[in-house]
């Protein structure tokens, strides 16, 4: 009902406003007490509006408050001033504020006003325990409920009565609190924890003052360890030495700490199930030194040290020998002695084997006698051992054998292995390989197994092995190993001795050669487009010749040759082509010219004769056709063929008296003649 009444009033006011004229003269904001306030201070933001209207009553308008362009308060009013109240200002209230007035379709907004809130409220700090044992954990809770996260927290662990910060932790939380664990160290006694909070205002961080927690009392988990030495006064070698380290443990402790006794850095005794650790040993002078007792549990460690001095009963024995390096067959002499020459029991040992129970020991050295020797001297319960002395007995090397691993002939450029071996002799053995009497390689071998050198010989080569070891005898040489190297055929060429142009009838000599190749080499001569060689020859040389006595045009063309030997990787190598041209001798050319000219002349004579005969026949034909037929004297098979015979018959007046008329016949052109004659 109330809502309906309110809507009716607003509608009425709106209608009234539409009927009346109005204008928004001005609008601005004010902050009470100011635009810069302290944290927690009450703040009132006012929006002041000046409106002119023709209405007798004030028009109803809407006032909106914005912070950083976000609406924070909205009210409808007819008053000139409207307020937005913040009871306790905080850092998150800081920002840029403005207000807007809306009256019907008219609207006006103020400029932006910067509100600054100075200071940060004090945080609260609590601890989860007020008493803690060394090695424990204290959880600190630092909170600030007034401000909005993210909030920056800084917590410090401080020893009461000092200004030294023992540990500091920082964390930015998206909540209003933070929980941070602090370990309790052995140097901690009475602690307080300080907390500081910070809030980001724009680009500036505003921080609070430090606030301190309640006191936290630290109890010792265990005390500093203490030493007890027995016997308490002078300790002589042979006495039983007892070193005890003890510690006091807090009654709240749920387990014992670990107790460690060290001499220098070596651990000599430990205990994990007791309040003490004991190191007991028969005293020797080497037990003198600094002893440290450490008590450790998690992060807690405490230690104390003591110096122990032990009086020497007699010095350590010394083992002397004739030489530390002997040739096999020489005498090995060992002697054990103690300074001051006290009465003692002696033994001489090789590793763990007792060789003698006297001060001296001698024998003929063999290779198996190599090893570490020592001696002992004992007085009462005290037994001391000398330093270890190395002895090496060298067996002389046997003459080395030398051999290579090639199963077939060695081809130039291939890798071969040259092996050397001395079957007998003390290792390590130094092998030195000579190649062509010059040092090639040196290798040391720790056994009598063969040693292998690799090489790529390019020609016949001699190898020799030299071996040496610890023996005093001079180095030993092997026999000389001779290696024969065969070279494959390389660069086949073909040439002609008389030049590429050969005169017909002369001798033609072709030469096929290789740059390199171990014989025997097989050469083959080919003519282009012929599948089989026309000449083949195998020689122990790098070249071969082919002779042809009488050269003719048949020998003209392109030639090539091939060559191969047993070292050839491919079947054969082929030369490039050689072009041979055959030309005629000058006298042959002249003879041919004479013959040709003679043939031409003969042909011309025959042609001329033939021509004149034809012409004569052509003249005679019309005469024969114009005279009467002449009786045949012979049978029908006889013919009158010669014009001279016919002429004679005309003048034979005795046989026949005939009148005739001479007719002059003009000569015809050959084509006309052929056209008219049958």
UniProtKB/Swiss-Prot annotation:
The chain crosses the membrane at residues 590-610. Glycans are attached at residues 74, 141, 309, 345, 360, 424, 540. Keywords: Cell adhesion, Cell junction, Cell membrane, Disulfide bond, Glycoprotein, Immunoglobulin domain, Membrane, Phosphoprotein, Repeat, Signal, Transmembrane, Transmembrane helix. It comes from the Eukaryota. Residues 40-126, 135-213, 225-309, 315-391, 413-472, 488-577 form the Ig-like C2-type domain. Disulfide bonds join 47-99, 142-195, 245-293, 336-375, 420-465, 512-561. The modification Phosphotyrosine is found at residue 660. Its main location: membrane. Residues 634-653 are annotated as: Disordered. Residues 18-589 are extracellular. GO terms for molecular function: protein homodimerization activity; protein phosphatase binding; transmembrane signaling receptor activity. GO terms for biological process: angiogenesis; bicellular tight junction assembly; cell adhesion; cell surface receptor signaling pathway; cell-cell adhesion; cell-cell adhesion via plasma-membrane adhesion molecules; cellular response to mechanical stimulus; cellular response to transforming growth factor beta stimulus. GO terms for cellular component: cell periphery; cell surface; cell-cell contact zone; cell-cell junction; cytoplasm; external side of plasma membrane; extracellular space; membrane. InterPro entries: Ig-like_dom, Ig-like_dom_sf, Ig-like_fold, Ig_Fc_receptor, Ig_sub, Ig_sub2, Immunoglobulin_dom. A motif (ITIM motif) lies at residues 658-663. Residues 1-17 form the signal peptide. Cell adhesion molecule which is required for leukocyte transendothelial migration (TEM) under most inflammatory conditions. Tyr-660 plays a critical role in TEM and is required for efficient trafficking of PECAM1 to and from the lateral border recycling compartment (LBRC) and is also essential for the LBRC membrane to be targeted around migrating leukocytes. Trans-homophilic interaction may play a role in endothelial cell-cell adhesion via cell junctions. Heterophilic interaction with CD177 plays a role in transendothelial migration of neutrophils. Trans-homodimer (via Ig-like C2-type 1 and Ig-like C2-type 2 domains); trans-homodimerization is required for cell-cell interaction. Forms a complex with BDKRB2 and GNAQ. Interacts with BDKRB2 and GNAQ. Interacts with PTPN11. Interacts with FER. Interacts with CD177; the interaction is Ca(2+)-dependent; the interaction is direct. The Ig-like C2-type domains 2 and 3 contribute to formation of the complex with BDKRB2 and in regulation of its activity. This is Platelet endothelial cell adhesion molecule. The lineage of its organism: Eukaryota, Metazoa, Chordata, Craniata, Vertebrata.
């Amino acid at each position: 009902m109330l809502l309906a009444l309110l809507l009716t009033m607003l509608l009425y006011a709106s209608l009234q406003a539409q009927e009346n004229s109005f204008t928004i003269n001005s609008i601005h904001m004010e902050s009470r007490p100011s635009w810069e306030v302290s944290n927690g201070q009450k703040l009132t933001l006012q929006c002041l509006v000046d409106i002119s209207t023709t209405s007798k009553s004030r028009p109803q308008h809407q006032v909106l408050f914005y912070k950083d362009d976000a609406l924070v308060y909205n009210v409808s009013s007819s008053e000139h001033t409207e307020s937005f109240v913040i009871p306790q200002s905080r850092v998150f209230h800081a920002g840029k504020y403005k207000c807007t007035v809306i009256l019907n379709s008219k609207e006006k907004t103020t400029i932006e006003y910067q509100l600054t809130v100075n200071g940060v409220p004090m945080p609260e700090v609590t601890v989860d325990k007020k008493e803690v044992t060394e090695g424990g954990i204290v959880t600190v809770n630092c909170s600030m409920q007034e401000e909005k996260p993210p909030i920056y927290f800084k917590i410090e662990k401080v020893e009461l009565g000092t200004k030294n910060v023992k540990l500091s932790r920082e964390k930015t939380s998206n909540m209003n609190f933070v929980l941070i664990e602090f370990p309790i160290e052995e140097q901690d006694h009475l602690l307080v924890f300080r907390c500081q909070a910070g809030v980001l205002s724009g680009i500036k961080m505003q921080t609070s003052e430090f606030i301190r927690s309640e006191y936290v009392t630290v109890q010792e988990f265990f005390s500093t360890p203490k030493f007890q030495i027995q016997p308490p006064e002078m300790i002589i070698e042979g006495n039983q030495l007892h070193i005890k380290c003890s510690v006091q443990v807090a009654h709240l402790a749920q387990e014992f700490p670990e107790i460690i006794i060290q001499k220098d850095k070596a651990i000599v005794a430990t205990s994990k199930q007791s309040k003490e650790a004991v190191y007991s040993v028969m005293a020797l002078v080497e037990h003198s030194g600094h002893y440290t007792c450490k008590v450790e549990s998690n992060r807690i460690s405490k230690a104390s040290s003591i110096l122990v001095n032990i009086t020497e009963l007699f010095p350590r024995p010394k083992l002397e020998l004739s030489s530390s390096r002997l040739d096999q067959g020489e005498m090995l002499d060992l002697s054990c002695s103690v300074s001051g020459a006290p009465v003692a029991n002696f033994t001489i040992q090789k590793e763990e084997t007792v060789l003698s129970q006297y001060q001296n020991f001698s024998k003929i050295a063999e290779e198996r006698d190599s090893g570490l020797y020592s001696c002992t001297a004992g007085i009462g319960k005290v037994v001391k051992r000398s330093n270890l002395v190395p002895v090496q007995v060298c067996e002389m090397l046997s003459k080395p054998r030398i051999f290579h691993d090639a199963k077939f002939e060695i081809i130039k450029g291939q890798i071969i292995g040259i092996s050397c071996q001395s079957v007998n002799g003390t290792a390590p053995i130094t092998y030195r390989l000579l190649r062509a009497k010059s040092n090639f390689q040196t290798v040391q071998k720790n056994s009598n197994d063969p040693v292998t050198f690799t090489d790529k010989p390019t020609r016949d080569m001699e190898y020799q092995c030299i071996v040496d070891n610890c023996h005093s005898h001079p180095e030993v040489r092997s026999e000389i190993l001779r290696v024969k190297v065969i070279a494959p055929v390389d660069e086949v060429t073909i040439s002609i001795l008389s030049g590429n142009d050969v005169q017909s009838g002369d001798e033609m000599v072709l030469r096929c050669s290789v740059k390199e190749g171990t014989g025997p080499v097989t050469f083959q001569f080919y003519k282009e487009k012929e599948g089989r060689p026309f000449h083949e020859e195998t020689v122990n040389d790098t070249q071969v010749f082919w002779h042809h006595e009488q050269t003719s045009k048949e020998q003209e063309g392109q030639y090539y040759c091939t060559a191969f030997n047993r070292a050839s990787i491919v079947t054969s190598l082929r030369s490039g082509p050689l072009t041979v041209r055959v030309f005629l001798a000058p006298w042959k050319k002249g003879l041919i010219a004479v013959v040709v000219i003679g043939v031409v002349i003969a042909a011309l004579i025959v042609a001329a004769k033939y021509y004149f005969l034809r012409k004569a026949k052509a003249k005679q034909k019309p005469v024969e056709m114009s005279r009467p037929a002449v009786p045949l004297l012979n049978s029908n098979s006889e013919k009158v063929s010669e014009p001279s015979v016919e002429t004679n018959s005309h003048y034979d007046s005795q046989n026949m008296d005939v009148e005739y008329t001479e007719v002059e016949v003009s000569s015809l052109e050959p084509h006309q003649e052929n056209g008219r004659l049958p």
